[in-house]
Structures are given as structure tokens and as C-alpha cells.
Amino acid sequence: MPYPINEGAARRAKEMNSFSDYKEGSATAEYRAMVDKAAAIAEKQKSRVDPMYHEKIDHLLDTYARKLAENMNQGFAIDARVPSVMIAGPANFPVGKKEKQNRARDSNMEEWRYIQGLLDKIRSTGMGGISADDPAVIEKLQKKLDGLERSQLIMK
């Protein structure tokens, strides 16, 4: 399920914005840690909900992993466009290009926030009510009714 992270782009982004050296594999390690955390959230949610929701949770997890990799790779490409003023120096610094880069960073950050929202979708899958437009609505309602009837019998 993990998607590739462009380590070359991550290195270039680090070199354009920092005097410290890039640690090989650190971008992939950061990505894997985030995906592992999402996978743990998904497994916890699967243990709490009916098995009919497991496929949806897996799909959301895969979407999270794919979009996160795309977002991180895009972020590295954006960061590598224009060097930091600390790296390039103030003489003939391309202010217009830097402003364009900052707008692209803002857009990339909005996308990242949306991707993090997928974790909330994973956490809430199977916890809400039954939707009338759900193709398995009758099956779900019957299962819920059976469970409520069993609870009623136990209470008697």
C-alpha cells in the first residue's frame, strides 16, 4: 500500500531551504510513520464496527496513503523551486518567484489539511446512522432491528 516518495526532490528541497544536510530516507520514514499511524486508526475502527464497513475503511486508508504521498512529493517540488533568502542571499533575490512559491505552498497546505480530514472519515465510518440511499439499507435495518429485539428480550 505505501506509495513512493521522491527522495531526490526531498533532498533538493532541503538543500534549497537549509544549511544542514539531508538525511537519506528521512522523507520516506516520515511518510511511513504517518501511514502506519493511519493504519492503526483504521484497525482500531475496524474492531469497533460491523465487517461490512471494513472495505470502506480500507479504501479510505489507501486513498489517504496515495494522496499523502502525492502531497508530500508536490511539497518537495514546490520547496525546490526557489531558494531561501538565507541560502541565495538578498542580492537579486527573485521576490516575485518567491511569492508565487508561497501561494503554491498555501495551496499544498490546504490539500494536506483535506488529506488529514480523511483520518476523521476513517474514525467515523460505521458510527453514524443508516442512510436511505445506501444499497444495503434493508440488510442494515434488519440487522439493527434483530439486535434491538435481542436486547429487549434480555431486559425482560
Where are these regions (language model features)?
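Long, charge-dense low-complexity segments
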Residues: M1-K156
